[in-house]
């Protein structure tokens, strides 16, 4: 039976995507609330924070002295030690370190320098597959939803610039397969993916910050619908964290800086004929 968090959920602040300041952060949650959750629910919440560990692992593999994002589940010292163990051919218990990260680090260390493998894509594939097997219906659905909308947008961009679509799709879901193989205008997905038409409209927005805002609004509304009947559960707490991180990101990214960032991404897309990790 799942745990109920009546007092905790009742005390969580109301959030809006338009909030311009926060008195609470995802880092605060980790230090103040995380340990009050059940062991099984902490594992679900760990999936949220693993996104920061993913970025940290990539940084440390390239530079062991790199500054990491402290919002992750693991310290720089822990990650460096795990990388060292795997570099020497050792093994790490899945109870101690997620198996997908061990797999990724091993694959990274064994990849020839001349390889054209995009490490960010490989890591994203492993992460999504790992998260979608978590056993929680809402959390698994969230990761699949996010994977699908990211891939659909990447497919639109690839088709627009006449790039190979299949090589830019991340993951192995039915939607991924349709995007890789279908030549139909809608990839055969307009009746399969509820938000497909919304994504078509969003992809046509030329003002890049507005487009990203619309995407976050789409994600926000999806969460609201998905947890409508989950009142005091870990699902509502997980959604709270997702919303909190969204607002944090927008507060730290003002409109002018946002336009510069996204225009540089588009420019790199045109110049490199590759889809960088930031665009996914």
Model-predicted regions and their roles:
Residues 1-280:
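Extended alpha-helical surfaces
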């Amino acid at each position: 039976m799942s745990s109920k968090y009546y007092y905790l959920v009742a005390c969580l602040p109301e959030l809006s995507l338009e909030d311009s300041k926060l008195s609470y952060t995802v880092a605060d949650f980790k230090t103040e609330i995380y340990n009050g959750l059940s062991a099984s629910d902490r594992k679900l919440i760990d999936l949220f924070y693993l996104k920061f560990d993913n970025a940290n692992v990539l940084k440390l593999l390239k530079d062991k002295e790199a500054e990491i994002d402290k919002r992750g589940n693991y310290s720089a010292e822990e990650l460096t030690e795990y990388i060292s163990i795997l570099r020497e051919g050792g093994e790490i218990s899945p109870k101690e370190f997620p198996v997908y990260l061990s797999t990724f680090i091993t694959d990274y260390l064994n990849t020839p320098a001349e390889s054209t493998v995009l490490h960010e894509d490989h890591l994203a594939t492993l992460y999504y597959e790992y998260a979608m097997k978590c056993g929680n219906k809402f959390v698994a659905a969230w990761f699949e939803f996010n994977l699908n909308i990211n891939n659909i947008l990447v497919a639109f961009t690839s088709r627009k610039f006449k790039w190979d679509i299949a090589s830019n799709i991340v993951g192995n879901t039915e939607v991924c397969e349709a995007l890789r193989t279908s030549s139909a205008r809608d990839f055969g997905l307009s009746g399969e993916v509820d938000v497909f038409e919304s994504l078509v409209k969003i992809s046509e927005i030329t003002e890049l910050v507005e487009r990203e805002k619309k995407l976050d609004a789409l994600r926000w509304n999806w969460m609201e619908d998905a947890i409508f009947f989950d009142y005091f559960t870990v699902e509502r707490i997980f959604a709270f964290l997702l919303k909190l991180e969204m607002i944090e990101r927008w507060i730290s990214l003002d409109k002018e800086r946002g336009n510069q960032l996204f225009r540089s991404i588009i420019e790199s897309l045109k110049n490199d004929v590759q889809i960088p990790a930031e665009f996914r």
